[in-house]
Amino acid sequence: MTPQQLTEEYIFAHDLREASAKIYRAATKALLKHFGPTATVQDVDHRAVLGWRRKVLEQGLSKRSWNTYSNHLRTIWGYAIEHELVTHSQVNPFRKTTVIPPRRASKTVAAEAILRARSWLSMQVGAERCTGDRARITPAWFWLCTFEVFYYTGIRLNALLCIRKRDIDWDNQLILIRGETEKTHKEFVVPITEGLVPHLSRLLQEAEKAGFADDDQLFNVNRFSPHYKSKTMNSDQVEAMYRKLTEKVGVRMTPHRFRHTLATDLMKAPERNIHLTKCLLNHSNIQTTMSYIEADYDHMRAVLHARSLAQGALENVRKVDYSGSPQASAKPKPCGQPLARVGEVPPPEARTEPSEPREHTQETGIQRGPTSWEAEAVPQPPDTFEQSVLFTLMAQHLSNRAATASAVPAATSGSGGRGSAARDSLA
């Protein structure tokens, strides 16, 4: 028996959605590409599968894609072993062949990009209406409606393709998503919001004009334009529209990214409700919903800032030491009366009262710097860079002069006349 025959046997024995059967066949096709079209199930053993894995990963296949192949083929072989379709071995060759993929950030679409995409689609609608010419995506009104349904509801692509005309409950403003069309096999409804009403209203009106029956596929572009020949709309047509939209806007957009974006936006809202988000996306568990949500870094920054305020961490961060060279970002605190620069003497009427004398050090007689003021919890006096430089030069000059004066008596103790001459010259 060949791997392809095994796959068809598995699909025949299970009630699979078309999309699921497509994935099983794609995994089998990838296997035959490596092992050859004439390969049999006996050729596929555990070591051969590991060799295939190494080869395709080295060629650039993503780990997630490999895991998709491995998981689906393991399911097929498990079914074959259980039902004795494979008798040469009871060991599943795909057991423990998955790899750990990197955790990627949630794929969301920025609000600004969504606005640009909506604006471009609206322009296409207006251009078609005014000129009668075919837009780049036609009919533009239909694709704008499709875009808005994904934006407002976050439903899966397959769910949109399976919506029938009868699934729109206009009286209660609800859309029914049938369980047989869903990945989770659960039936649910999504509300029709105010922003979606005009788009769905036109879609239903056009469907009435085209003679749609209640069980007909509602989102079927082929029945709204003579430029399409297919009887039903498929995922390729929707994905082709989103590729054009991505090219125009410059930001990757897909229906599934709109699901991630909706989940993230709902959890950013003040009335965030994880259960509501889970139900709207029709997930089986909370963990899946949480994996859809992108981290809110603005909220994270605010929480971290509140923590630092509560623990007094910013009190030390905000202190600036002006004793060193000034930084471009460091600015002195404003004072009530600006100080005059060196060489500038304020006029008599502008002069202020002399300030209280400041404490001086015993060694040099120079007032203490900012470090001493901070250590004693005394408010720092206003300071400028020019004054700091002047005080530093004066301190160095006085220190050098004092050191020279103390060295002169030692030099003159052995030669009185020469010492007097030296003092005269230093003076």
Curated annotation (Swiss-Prot):
UniProt-listed Gene3D superfamilies: 1.10.150.130, Intergrase catalytic core
Segments forming domain Core-binding (CB): 1-81
Domain of life where this protein originates: Bacteria
Main subcellular location: cytoplasm
InterPro entries per the UniProt record, alphabetical: CB, DNA_brk_join_enz, Integrase-like_cat_sf, Integrase_catalytic, Integrase_recombinase_N, Tyrosine_recombinase_XerCD
One of the record's GO cellular component terms: cytoplasm
Tyr recombinase domain ranges (all copies): 116-305
UniProt keyword list: Cell cycle, Cell division, Chromosome partition, Cytoplasm, DNA integration, DNA recombination, DNA-binding, Plasmid
Biased composition (Basic and acidic residues): 350-362
Pfam families (UniProt xref): Phage_integrase
Coiled coil: none
GO biological processes: cell division; chromosome segregation; DNA integration; DNA recombination
Compartments where found: Cytoplasm
Record-annotated active site: 156, 183, 256, 259, 283, 292 (o-(3'-phospho-dna)-tyrosine intermediate)
Disordered, as annotated region: 323-384, 401-427
Any one GO molecular function term: DNA binding
Composition-biased stretches (Low complexity): 402-413
Function recorded in the entry: Site-specific tyrosine recombinase, which acts by catalyzing the cutting and rejoining of the recombining DNA molecules.
Misc remark: In contrast to other XerC proteins, it has a longer C-terminal part.
UniProt-listed PANTHER family: PHAGE INTEGRASE-RELATED, PROPHAGE INTEGRASE INTD-RELATED
Protein name, per record: Putative tyrosine recombinase XerC
Organism (species): Pseudomonas aeruginosa
Lineage of origin: Bacteria, Pseudomonadati, Pseudomonadota, Gammaproteobacteria, Pseudomonadales
